[in-house]
Structures are given as structure tokens and as C-alpha cells.
Design a protein with these regions (language model features):
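Conserved catalytic core of two-component sensor histidine kinases
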Residues: 34, 55, 183
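Amphipathic, Lys/Arg- and hydrophobic-enriched alpha-helical face
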Residues: 3, 33-52, 68, 94, ...
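Sigma70-family region 2
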Residues: 22-23, 47-49, 62-79, 96-98
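Structural recognition of an alpha-helix C-terminal capping motif at a helix-to-coil junction
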Residues: 42, 56-63, 76-88
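His-Asp-centered metal-binding catalytic motifs of divalent-metal-dependent phosphohydrolases/nucleases
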Residues: 161
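Intrinsic, short, N-terminal disordered tails of RNA polymerase sigma-factor systems
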Residues: 1-19, 31, 98-156, 166-282
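Arg/Lys-rich amphipathic alpha helix in sigma70-family domain 2
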Residues: 70-74, 84-105, 194-195, 199
Length: 282
């Protein structure tokens, strides 16, 4: 499966568009950035987790790209330069926000089940004809929730390497740190997320306390259920361990259409409620 964050672009054509855009050709600039608009938004959305914030940041990023296009010298891939601007916009934003608790999702689920009007609203949303519960989109949602418990720098490291599939060298350059520093930061981020998933996720651990994926599928009803996923599985021939399970989860995440898929409205509401609760706690 191709990476959701990598549009089909011919490098030679992109290079020509860059050159024309650097000489003030606005049409060329539009053609240059348009294939990246959806991947950029997806990355920003998963970093900041609120749609309105992501839309605002995307516009800011595109303005910065336009203002600085002449500074791009081709030392790195255009994708790296582009996502570098987006990354630092996200980091600036996230540094003004509280980090989320690892158990934030579970607390949100308890709040919903304890308030009949919230549960009724969720059931109504999930019963709409256009709604299909895609469990992979929820896994991507969960991944971003757990990532929000990391420092902004760790969150960016794991997103750049594991979801956008930049090399360690490219990701380190984007974050303006040495490669050893980046690798250490990524290792810490993966370790923290692995511990969190192992303790929470019933898809990889039968003693995991979070059955939200299965619970939401049950609420959706037979007509609105997508494909089931009993557990996250590693590829044949690969040993099952926390590292390989994390890699298998990341593969699902990078190809899930969280931003505009059929569960979009539901996850927007979940993110809004989580952000409100986590920002307001003392």
C-alpha cells in the first residue's frame, strides 16, 4: 500500500515548477504545492489534533512557503523543506498547549458513557447513512492521542520517521538536531508509546483496558460497520514483540484516511472534547 502522505510526483517536473515559482510564477507555485496540500494538512492535523487549528496552520505554512520559496536551494528534497516549515509551525503551536495524559481517551470514554445525552448524540452520528466505522481510522486517531502525551519534539520525531517515513538523516535536519540526538529522541518516543499501548490497547494485549475500537464498532450497528480487526498483526516471518507491533501499528496509521474518511466528524468531536478537557485541567 502506498503511503497516504506521499503523492505521485515526477521529481523532474517538480524541479521545473520550483524554478518557475522562484522566478515569481504564481501558477507554477500553485501546481507545485497543490499535490502536497492534503498530505500537509494530514500531518498538521495529526500533530495539533484540532481541525480549525490545523486549517489555520496550513494557511500560515503555505504563506511561509510562498514567501521563502527563493531560499530553497535543493540541498534536500522539496518534501523535506516543505515539511520542515510545517513541523516548526506545529512545534511553535504545541509549545503553547498542555501535553495530554496517556489515559485521556479512556477518561473521555468514561465521560461519554456517564452522560446519556452524549452517548445518544454519538449513536445518532454513527447511524447516519454516510457513516462507516473504519477501525483503521480510529487506530490513527488513537496514535495521535498517545503522541500528544509526548514532548512536542518527541511527537514530531515519531511522526516524521514512523508516519511520514523520512530517513533519520532527513528528520534530524528538519528538526535542526544531529542524527544521534534525533535517534535518541525517536527511541524515547517509541519506548513511551509502546509502554502506553501495551498497557491500554486490547488489540495487542488481552489484558489491555481499552476496548474502544470494538466498543465503537458495536455502537455503529451492522449497517455502519466497516472491516473488523481483532488484533494488530505483524508481517509473516517477523517475531512478535513490542517493536514489531509498534511498526505494524504505524503502517496502519500512515495509510489511514483520518482527516477526510467516513469517521471524520466523529473524530473531530472526540479531539475537541479531549483538547477541552486536557487544556482545562489544573
Amino acid at each position: 500500500v502506498s503511503n497516504y502522505f506521499q503523492p505521485s510526483i515526477v521529481p523532474e517536473e517538480e524541479s521545473k515548477l520550483v524554478e518557475r515559482a522562484q522566478h515569481g510564477d504564481r501558477d507554477a507555485f500553485g501546481s507545485l504545492v497543490e499535490p502536497w496540500r492534503k498530505p500537509l494538512f494530514g500531518y498538521i492535523y495529526r500533530m495539533v489534533t484540532l481541525r480549525q487549528d490545523a486549517e489555520d496552520l496550513l494557511q500560515d505554512v503555505l504563506v511561509r512557503v510562498l514567501e521563502n520559496i527563493r531560499e530553497y536551494r535543493g540541498e534536500a528534497r522539496f518534501k523535506s523543506w516543505l515539511f520542515g516549515i510545517a513541523t516548526h509551525a506545529c512545534l511553535d503551536h504545541l509549545r503553547t498547549r498542555k501535553r495530554w495524559r496517556v489515559e485521556a481517551q479512556r477518561i473521555g470514554e468514561q465521560e461519554t458513557t456517564e452522560h446519556p445525552e452524549q452517548l445518544a448524540g454519538l449513536r445518532e452520528l454513527m447511524s447516519e447513512a454516510s457513516f462507516v466505522y473504519e477501525i483503521r481510522e480510529h487506530i490513527a486517531f488513537c496514535f495521535s492521542c498517545i503522541a500528544r502525551s509526548l514532548s512536542p519534539e518527541e511527537q514530531a520525531a515519531v511522526m516524521l520517521k514512523e508516519v511520514l517515513e523520512f530517513t533519520s538523516e532527513e528528520a534530524a535536519a528538519i528538526l535542526r538536531v544531529s542524527e544521534p540526538v534525533f535517534r535518541h529522541r525517536l527511541s524515547d518516543a517509541r519506548s513511551k508509546m509502546t509502554v502506553a499501548f501495551d498497557g491500554l490497547c486490547a488489540l495487542i494485549n488481552k489484558t489491555g483496558v481499552c476496548y474502544q475500537c470494538a466498543g465503537l464498532r458495536e455502537i455503529a450497528g451492522e449497517k455502519n460497520r466497516g472491516e473488523n480487526l481483532v488484533q494488530i498483526e505483524v508481517a509473516p516471518g517477523i517475531a512478535i514483540n513490542p517493536e514489531s507491533l509498534f511498526d505494524a501499528r504505524a503502517a496502519i496509521v500512515r495509510n489511514a484516511n483520518l482527516e477526510s474518511g467516513s469517521t471524520r466528524a466523529m473524530h473531530d468531536i472526540f479531539y475537541q472534547n479531549l483538547a477541552r478537557r486536557e487544556e482545562s485541567r489544573s
